[in-house]
A protein has these predicted regions:
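Long, polar/Ser/Thr-enriched low-complexity segments
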Residues: 12-49
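Extended, solvent-exposed, turn-rich assembly/linker loops in the middle of proteins
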Residues: 185-189, 197-207
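Glycine-rich, often proline-containing surface loops adjacent to acidic residues and nearby aromatics
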Residues: 43-49, 179-186
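A glycine-rich, hydrophobic loop/mini-helix early in the fold
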Residues: 64-100, 178-182
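Extracellular structured ligand-interaction cores
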Residues: 45-47, 201, 217-220
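Residue-level signal for secondary-structure boundary sites
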Residues: 56-60, 85, 230
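Small/polar beta-strand repeat architecture
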Residues: 3-11, 18-19, 89, 94-129, ...
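Oligomerization/assembly interface segments of phage tail-like spikes and tubes
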Residues: 37-58, 269, 274
Length: 274
């Protein structure tokens, strides 16, 4: 049987809501030293518990229909944090475009304790201050993960806000943006005139295509105010820190929704009642 989206009724609004973020994190504690070691796994996801107000039967019928058509956890619906339906930022268009400015599948990097990353090529030629890069393949795990660029020193060198471990000529490193595991987005404005900020606490919806009406594939919370680099006669470049980590790569050119972003949700129980 095909899985389909069932549109949620829009009224009345919920009288109470609790919004939660779930992670899969393993932890071990040494019985001898008390030292802890954690391992974060791929799973991340939102959940919500909501309460509707009392309503007359004519209105409640719409919700009953919706609940039954979901068929337990079989079908899905679009949903967002009921207490944050309008973003606080001033960005003045409905969506942004995903565009990686750094994307290298294999390169040699040198990491220094002054928090600089040196490449043996020119991979940072298009990077801008505020960009988030995602590194994998470094021998020292401290150097892997998402790093925010604070200075573009040269086409082959950047300074990041993270604390790095010293490593020389670390080969087979990947330096990418908008990929699975990253906690930051590399974007550009949707038009040459679009501008404005994306605020901490705003939500963004990663969409499945370059259409503003396409189905979302992940809902993200903004954790650092956006950085915007003006482009004369072109689309401004925008960088923003987000959580949770991306569950999948974002295709270049696909849209990230700013106005009324939503995620995909399912019922947690196969029993519905009223």
């Amino acid at each position: 049987m095909a899985v389909i989206e069932i549109a949620m009724p829009t009224t009345p609004n919920f009288m109470r809501s609790d919004f939660r973020l779930h992670r899969a994190v393993g932890q071990t504690v040494s019985p001898f030293t008390g030292k802890q070691k954690t391992q974060e796994y791929d799973y991340v996801g939102w959940s919500a518990q909501v309460t509707l107000p009392p309503m007359r039967r004519a209105v409640a019928a719409n919700w009953q229909s919706w609940l039954t058509r979901l068929k337990g956890s079989s079908n899905f619906f679009q949903f967002a944090d009921p207490d944050a339906l309008t973003n606080l930022g001033t960005y003045d268009t409905a969506y942004l475009e995903a565009v990686p400015r750094v994307s290298v599948a294999s390169t040699t990097l040198t990491f220094a304790t002054d928090n600089t990353i040196l490449d043996d090529g020119t991979i940072f030629a298009d990077a801008v201050v505020g960009d988030y890069i995602f590194i994998t393949g470094a021998n020292d795990t401290e150097n892997n993960g998402t790093h925010k660029i604070s200075v573009v020193n040269a086409n082959n060198k950047v300074t990041v806000t993270s604390t790095l471990a010293a490593e020389n000529n670390d080969s087979n490193c990947k330096v990418q943006q908008n990929v699975k595991g990253a906690t930051g987005l590399s974007l550009k404005a949707s038009t040459n005139t679009a501008a404005g900020s994306i605020a901490v606490g705003d939500y963004l919806g990663v969409l499945t295509s370059n259409s503003a009406t396409s189905v979302p594939k992940q809902l993200l919370l903004v954790t650092e105010v956006s950085t915007q680099t003006a482009v004369s006669g072109g689309k401004n470049l925008i960088s923003v820190g987000t959580e949770p980590k991306l569950r999948a790569d974002i295709t270049s050119g696909h849209f990230v929704k700013f106005t009324s972003p939503k995620g995909i949700f399912r019922l947690t129980d196969n029993i519905v009642e009223w």
